[in-house]
């Protein structure tokens, strides 16, 4: 059984027990959260139910494992003959979650 959830402006196909890296969520580590924006869910008999746009009465429970930062992205601007150089770095924060249960 799987579900398609939406979080952080992206969509993820998840199963129970999956470990997922999503955009940063403002919850402490170890807390159990619930995703309620469910786009689709498969039933035990193989049928798939789709929402318009989201399904009612379906939730996905997940536990927050850790928070972190992704690899450093370096942005370099350069204009020739003008002595213009700008270097900037960025590390995108993320949250790692483990899917515990798909509740229907």
Curated annotation (Swiss-Prot):
Q: Quick one: which gene encodes this?
A: rplU
Instruction: Tell me what organism the protein belongs to.
Output: Thermoanaerobacter pseudethanolicus (strain ATCC 33223 / 39E) (Clostridium thermohydrosulfuricum)
Q: Report the SS bond pairs.
A: none
- Which terms in the GO cellular component ontology are assigned? cytoplasm; ribonucleoprotein complex; ribosome
Domain of life where this protein originates: Bacteria
Q: What is this protein called?
A: Large ribosomal subunit protein bL21
Task: Say what the protein does.
Answer: This protein binds to 23S rRNA in the presence of protein L20.
List GO BP terms, alphabetically: translation
Instruction: Tell me which UniProt keywords the record has, alphabetically.
Output: Ribonucleoprotein, Ribosomal protein, RNA-binding, rRNA-binding
> What family does the Swiss-Prot or TrEMBL record give for this protein?
Belongs to the bacterial ribosomal protein bL21 family.
Quaternary structure annotation from Swiss-Prot or TrEMBL? Part of the 50S ribosomal subunit. Contacts protein L20.
A GO molecular function annotation here is: structural constituent of ribosome
Note the InterPro entries from the entry: bL21-like, bL21-like_sf, Ribosomal_bL21, Ribosomal_bL21_CS
Coiled-coil region list: none
């Amino acid at each position: 059984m799987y579900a398609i959830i939406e979080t952080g402006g992206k969509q993820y196909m998840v199963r129970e027990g999956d470990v997922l890296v999503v955009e940063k969520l403002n919850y402490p580590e170890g807390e159990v959260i619930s995703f309620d924006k469910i786009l689709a869910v498969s039933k035990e008999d193989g049928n798939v139910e789709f929402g318009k746009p989201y399904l009612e009465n379906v939730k996905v429970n997940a536990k927050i494992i850790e928070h972190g930062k992704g690899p450093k992205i370096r942005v370099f601007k350069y204009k020739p003959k003008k002595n213009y150089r700008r270097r900037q770095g960025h590390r995108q924060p993320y949250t790692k979650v483990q899917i515990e249960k798909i509740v229907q």
